């Protein structure tokens, strides 16, 4: 990965010979992630914006329930296409479990629920909507179509 402001990310760890250069880009990118964020920070986000706040990357029903309890407007159930953690449930399974739990608690109309990851065709979109998703994020099929066939490929994919 390259950034126009940083020419060689392999030196993020310093210039000494013992530095592990194999994680340069990953280490540089992770420096932008605030690991101290927690559920209590949602109140601060609410104080600085009137825009709806959604939480992306939800992978468990319990976290979806917490997002609702902390007043988030919606969530995006996502496992990053399964390429980050291959042992987690697919978003469509988490969606089914979450919507069932929300319906049981009469909370299913209080939060928008999107899914992202693992969606490859129109039938996946229909299944997600039928299971209660507000919307579906689709990336990879359109990225491949665009990179291979350009605008025509995206039109055909749609």
Kindly give the residue locations of the regions a language model identified.
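Active-site entrance/lid segments in N-terminal catalytic domains of soluble metabolic enzymes
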Residues: 1-65, 69, 81-84
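Alpha/beta catalytic cores of nucleotide-metabolism and tRNA/nucleoside-modifying enzymes
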Residues: 5-8, 93-115, 119-158
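Glycine-rich, proline-tolerant flexible connector loops at the mouths of alpha/beta enzymes
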Residues: 26, 79-89, 143-147
């Amino acid at each position: 990965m390259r950034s126009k402001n940083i020419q060689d990310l392999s030196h993020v760890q310093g210039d000494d010979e013992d530095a592990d250069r194999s994680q340069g880009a990953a280490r540089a990118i992770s420096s932008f992630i605030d690991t101290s964020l927690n559920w209590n920070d949602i109140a601060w986000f609410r104080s600085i914006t009137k825009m709806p706040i959604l939480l992306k990357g939800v992978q468990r029903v319990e976290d979806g329930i917490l997002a609702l309890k902390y007043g988030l407007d919606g969530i995006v159930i996502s496992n990053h296409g399964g390429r980050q953690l291959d042992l987690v449930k697919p978003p469509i399974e988490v969606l089914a479990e979450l919507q069932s739990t929300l319906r049981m608690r009469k909370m299913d109309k209080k939060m928008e629920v999107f899914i992202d990851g693992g969606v490859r065709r129109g039938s996946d979109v229909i299944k997600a909507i039928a299971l209660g998703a507000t919307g579906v994020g689709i990336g990879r099929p359109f990225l491949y179509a665009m990179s291979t066939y350009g605008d025509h490929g995206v039109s055909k994919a749609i």
